UniProtKB/Swiss-Prot annotation:
Proline transporter that mediates proline transport across the plasma membrane. Pfam families: Aa_trans. This is Probable proline transporter 2. GO terms for molecular function: amino acid transmembrane transporter activity. Its main location: membrane. One of its GO terms (biological process) is amino acid transmembrane transport. It comes from Oryza sativa subsp. japonica. The keyword Calcium does not apply. It is found in: Cell membrane. GO terms for cellular component: membrane; plasma membrane.
């Protein structure tokens, strides 16, 4: 089986039918899709969720190492996009082709959990941004976080009704980048100003020895979460041939230029506030009300766009399996179908987000339950299965080491994340106003 697309037929068959548009986007558009995920408003939490538990040395080394291993694992997965003369446009299609039907179902379950949790986190994040904006003008406790989360879910649903598939984002990716630059620049500048005026910062890693163990493991899961989508084959399905060469360009863009804003705001936030950094950086910064309001509203709007990327595999599944398959994407019956089906999906997302608004815990649990297995364990093992006759003993040992190591990390991170959720659940009630 040759998975090197440099010499393969660009007109390879597609693994299964799909109701969504594929093979239409240039590599740089896909690069911006990936960068939109990396620089989503989640970056405003990494100073608190990664740097505070790990400190300067652990956090810095962790971010760089996580980027390197994520680029490597995603490149492996990208090279598996075509096997047996077919382009496998879904992660589950690829796993099913290599392992069989049971693994198809397991991969789909893992991916569903991954994307559902990410989308839940996005809705929590959007709700936090809305509440932070309201509090700047009226801190009267009237507009509570669950109400903001409900409003965020409604806006996300409206956006989902109007964007039929991932490739249709196009100009919205430009808006997403613009919004990202606004809140990242404001957070960076205000943190820099606060850091200069604040005399001494405490960078001590908080918590008891046992608590630090769990928070460190959770931070490692957050590192993995920061760079990975868990849906690379679905994103790669939108790219023009040659699909591997173009996808590698998009990945290099994501992990070089595309990740610079993440590093800048994460390091600056931790430098300015130390171990007291909030899990939502804009809650820590001081500055003019209108500037902070603009940053929060930009974070809210960018989150609405970013959520659509991570919800697109579920939308594609629903549209392909249950949609009419007739008429254009904006035919009235197709629009009404999206309103009913996508609206229902996002309603469940929003309900879970409002019930358990513990953003950092969701990031950790998502990284543990699905990002580790999908991005690192499966990618390395699938590459072994496909290329085992062409790999040296050393290469085989390396991939098995990755499979075993990341499996253990996944289990440890899941335990740590569940512990954090249980602790927070005892501290806060359902539908808490955090």
């Amino acid at each position: 089986m040759n998975i090197d697309m440099a010499n393969s037929d660009d007109k390879a068959l597609i693994s299964e039918d799909t109701a969504h548009q594929i093979s239409a986007d240039p590599w740089y558009q896909v690069g911006f899709v990936l960068t939109t995920g990396v620089n989503s408003a989640y970056v405003l939490g990494y100073s608190g969720s990664v740097m505070v538990p790990l400190g300067w040395i652990g956090g810095t080394c962790g971010l760089i190492l996580a980027a390197a291993i994520s680029l490597y694992a995603n490149a492996l997965l990208a090279r598996l996009h075509e096997i047996g003369g077919k382009r496998h446009i879904r992660y589950r299609d690829l796993a099913g082709h290599i392992y069989g039907r049971k693994m198809y179902s397991l991969t789909w379950a893992l991916q569903y959990v991954n994307l559902f949790m990410i989308n839940t986190g996005f809705i929590i994040l959007a709700g936090q941004a809305l509440k932070a904006t309201y509090v700047l003008f009226r801190d009267d406790g009237v507009l509570k976080l669950p109400y903001c989360i409900a409003l965020s879910g409604f806006v996300c649903a409206l956006f989902a009704f109007g964007i039929p598939y991932l490739s249709a984002l196009r100009i919205w990716l430009g808006f997403s980048t613009f919004f990202s630059l606004i809140y990242i620049t404001i957070a960076f500048v205000l943190s820099l100003r606060d850091g200069i005026t604040t005399p001494a910062k405490d960078y001590t890693i908080p918590g008891s020895h046992s608590a630090r163990i769990f928070t460190t493991i959770g931070a490692v899961a957050n590192l993995v979460f920061a760079y990975n989508t868990g849906m690379l084959p679905e994103i790669q399905a939108t790219i023009r041939p040659p699909v591997v060469k173009n996808m590698e360009k998009a990945l290099w863009f994501q992990f070089t230029v595309g990740s610079l804003p993440l590093y800048a705001v994460t390091f600056m936030g931790y430098w300015a506030y130390g171990s007291s950094t909030s899990s939502y950086l804009l809650n820590s910064v001081k500055g003019p009300v209108w500037v902070k309001a603009m940053a929060n509203l930009s974070a809210f709007l960018q989150t609405v766009i970013a959520l659509h990327i991570f919800a697109s595999p579920m939308y594609e599944f629903l549209d392909t399996k249950y949609g009419s398959g007739h008429g254009g994407p904006f035919a009235i019956h197709n629009v009404m179908f999206r309103v009913g089906v996508r609206g229902g999906y996002l309603t469940v997302n929003t309900l879970v987000a409002a019930m358990l608004p513990f953003l950092g815990d969701f990031m950790s649990l998502t990284g543990a339950l699905s990002t580790f297995p999908l991005t690192f364990v499966l990618a390395n093992h699938m590459y072994l299965m496909v290329k085992r006759h062409k790999l040296s003993t050393l290469q085989i040992s390396w991939h098995w080491l990755n499979v075993a190591g990341f499996s253990l990390l996944s289990i440890a991170a899941a335990v740590a994340a569940l512990r954090l959720i249980m602790v927070d659940s005892r501290t806060y009630h359902l539908f808490a106003d955090l």
